[in-house]
Amino acid sequence: MNNKEFNMEQFKKLAAVVSEDELDEMLDENVTGAASSIPCAKVVVKVTTVVVAATTGFDWCPTGACTTSCRF
């Protein structure tokens, strides 16, 4: 596998996989919209002991972080 290929099965073993609704709920508790101190370009969610970092380039925008600056 070269560096450009993405293997979802290997990713699932390494990362926490949560539903969009769960992400929205977690972010709604931590993000207050445009006035948030958390930059939506780097949303970090701690799930148990696994930290999942979503940075620019992701193709989803949780409703809790859908301010103008979060629409990539």
Swiss-Prot record:
GO annotations of cellular component type: extracellular region
Keywords, sorted A to Z: Antibiotic, Antimicrobial, Bacteriocin, Lantibiotic, Secreted, Thioether bond
Residue ranges listed under propeptide: 1-34
GO molecular function: signaling receptor binding
Record-listed 2,3-didehydrobutyrine modification sites: 48-49
Residues that bear 2,3-didehydroalanine (Ser): 37
Cross-link (Beta-methyllanthionine (Thr-Cys)): 55-61, 63-66, 67-70
Highest taxon in the source lineage: Bacteria
UniProt KW Transmembrane helix keyword: no
Modification comment: Contains LL-lanthionine and DL-beta-methyllanthionine, when coepressed in E.coli with the flavecin synthetase FlvM2.
Lanthionine (Ser-Cys), cross-linked positions: 36-40
NCBIfam families: lant_II_LchA2
Function of the molecule: Lanthionine-containing peptide antibiotic (lantibiotic) that is probably active on Gram-positive bacteria, since its analog [Del1]Flvbeta.e shows antibacterial activity against Gram-positive bacteria. This activity is not synergistically enhanced by [Del2]Flvalpha.a, an analog of Flvalpha.a, which is encoded by the same operon than Flvbeta.e. The bactericidal activity of lantibiotics is based on depolarization of energized bacterial cytoplasmic membranes, initiated by the formation of aqueous transmembrane pores.
Official protein name in the record: Lantibiotic Flvbeta.e
